[in-house]
Amino acid sequence: MELLLLSNSTLPGKAWLEHALPLVAEQLHGRRSAVFLPFAGVTQTWDDYTAKTAAVLAPLGVSVTGIHSVADPVAAIADAEVVIVGGGNTFQLLKESRERGLLAPIVAAVKRGALYIGWSAGANLACPTIRTTNDMPIVDPQGFDALGLFPLQINPHFTNALPEGHKGETREQRIRELLVVAPELTVIGLPEGNWIQVSKGQATLGGPNTTYVFNAGEEAVPLEAGHRF
């Protein structure tokens, strides 16, 4: 399988998805036809989100079609060479994808050779479940099971920073709480600017920041770019 799972879409001082474009180009391998799932977009229309994504990827020769705009989305996914899943609200993304019957077709397409690209919520959707999302508002997606294309849980936008005087939990504390109730999970705290590329059965970590892996009852393990899972 070919996956590109990004923690986020925008870095300080860079345009939207600018840091991801070289990675996308590297993994395209001649693929040009893409479908885009805009369902995580809550404060922007799905048409606008699709147009924005299409404009960014056009210089790479990728043609993007919004899956919400086609008469037969299952057939469109089956025919696509690239499946792109945008960030935003993970609950809304999973709810819409499940209700439209798109989860199994996406898995089948990627297993047949389509490239999967997802950032933030789109990276969450590639995991076994969405239980490591950070998102609000919460809508009911009728279950948290997701695509399961990547075997570990990703926590996008990972940071342990807290504003001075803030008394809420750190991100690590929240992940630790999850591992108490679900000790079978392994969670990757993926900071902004980092990504995971899967190619030819090998998953490789990229990006400038330290990533952390969390397992129940164990110390967090720091990982740097180039680590292979």
Swiss-Prot record:
It is found in: Cytoplasm. One of its GO terms (cellular component) is cytoplasm. Keywords: Cytoplasm, Dipeptidase, Hydrolase, Protease, Serine protease. SUPFAM superfamilies: Class I glutamine amidotransferase-like. The keyword Acyltransferase does not apply. It comes from the Bacteria. CDD domains: GAT1_Peptidase_E. GO terms for biological process: proteolysis. InterPro entries: Class_I_gatase-like (IPR029062), Peptidase_S51 (IPR005320), Peptidase_S51_dipeptidase-E (IPR023172). GO terms for molecular function: dipeptidase activity; serine-type peptidase activity. The keyword tRNA-binding does not apply. Its EC number is 3.4.13.21. The active site is at S120 (charge relay system), D135 (charge relay system), H157 (charge relay system). It catalyses: Dipeptidase E catalyzes the hydrolysis of dipeptides Asp-|-Xaa. It does not act on peptides with N-terminal Glu, Asn or Gln, nor does it cleave isoaspartyl peptides. Belongs to the peptidase S51 family. Hydrolyzes dipeptides containing N-terminal aspartate residues. May play a role in allowing the cell to use peptide aspartate to spare carbon otherwise required for the synthesis of the aspartate family of amino acids. PANTHER family: ALPHA-ASPARTYL DIPEPTIDASE, PROTEASE S51 ALPHA-ASPARTYL DIPEPTIDASE. This is Peptidase E. The gene is pepE.
